[in-house]
Regions:
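N-terminal helix-turn-helix DNA-binding module of bacterial transcription factors
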Residues: 1-17
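Short, well-ordered beta-strand segments
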Residues: 14, 22-24, 79, 141, ...
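Alpha-helical recognition/docking segments in bacterial nutrient-uptake
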Residues: 16-130, 134, 193-194
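Flexible loop/turn connectors
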Residues: 170, 190-303
Length: 303
């Protein structure tokens, strides 16, 4: 109401470039993208740029207001990692002519207009499901929070393909919708255990969910991995400290930050030559520990 603007905004308007880039991601993914900061800043710092980390709400009205506020600033570029990319987002970015790189795969994004760097979530899901099958598990539940159709489709695609290859059960009851948190995983696991409907194995879309499943199993006297296999996703620091140690997916988040930043600066610093938008797909790694029945040395890493 008093026309206050942060100092960096005022100063930026005094030069042709603000030396600011924004990294936009969903609030729910705050922990997931925490490691990307080092990757982005390692490249941005070399070029004298500052990275603004902008968590965006899921609720549509707040989301729209936050995005408008951010793009009203003088940005030299942005990296987009929100769970969704709507036509109105594209229109807003085009109107402001902000160079943009996508850090997720979006079906809605024009492939001929934006550079894209993303992690192959379908491959991650496929590899983990294959590992669970190789450990002798057939009924493998997939636990995730149904908040992003794009992520859900990729996650389910890999799981379903691996099960189909082995003619393993793929019924809808094995798709377990739960909040992406320890409390969410715990509540869903308790519900399944109380009802006698727990699958042989549960592959969770986050380590936090998996920790909740482990807690529920412990309270109910269910032995992991002898009676229930549990797998996570994201290789959080606690995954090697819980009991049993958690088998999970190691995602190249730091590398994602480096490549996305390099792509963005290629656009920002383009001297006028035609640059064809490119796509870089980063592959995950499987970090095998004890929670799914593995008896090999802990931390064996498979490409």
């Amino acid at each position: 109401r008093v026309n206050y603007a942060p100092a960096w905004t005022v100063e930026s308007r005094m030069s042709s470039r603000s030396r600011l880039i924004a990294f936009l991601f969903s609030e729910a993914d705050y922990y997931f993208y925490s490691d990307i900061r080092s990757g982005l800043e390692s490249i941005a710092g070399l070029r004298g740029y500052t990275v603004l980390f902008c968590p965006i709400a899921a609720e549509q009205q707040r989301r729209s207001q936050q995005l408008r506020t951010i793009f009203e600033q003088k940005l030299d570029g942005a990296i987009w990692a929100l769970r969704d990319f709507y036509p109105e987002d594209i229109k807003m970015i085009d109107e402001r002519q902000v160079p943009l790189v996508l850090a997720r795969k979006y079906d809605s994004a024009p492939t001929d207009r934006y550079n894209c760097c993303y992690i192959n979530f379908a491959e991650a899901s496929y590899r983990m499901t294959r590992h669970l099958l190789e450990m002798g598990h057939r009924r493998i539940g997939l636990m995730f929070e149904n908040v992003s159709q794009q992520f859900m489709n990729s996650f389910c695609q890999g799981w379903e393909l691996a099960l189909k290859e082995e003619a393993a059960p793929r019924e809808a009851s094995l798709l377990l919708n739960a909040p992406n948190s320890m409390a969410g995983g715990y509540a869903k696991a308790m519900e399944l255990l109380d009802a006698g409907e727990m699958p042989e194995a549960v592959f969770c879309a986050s380590d936090e969910q998996a920790f909740g499943v482990l807690k529920a199993a412990h309270e109910k006297g269910v032995r992991v991995p002898e009676e229930l296999a549990v797998a996570g996703f994201t290789d959080s620091p606690m995954s090697n400290l819980c009991d049993p140690e958690l088998t999970t997916i190691d995602l190249p988040i730091y590398r994602l930050g480096i490549i996305a930043a390099r792509m963005l600066f290629d656009v920002i610093e383009d001297t006028g030559s035609e640059v064809t938008p490119g796509e870089v797909v980063l592959q995950p790694k499987l970090r095998i520990r004890r929670s799914c029945g593995n008896e090999k040395p802990i931390n064996v890493l498979f490409e």
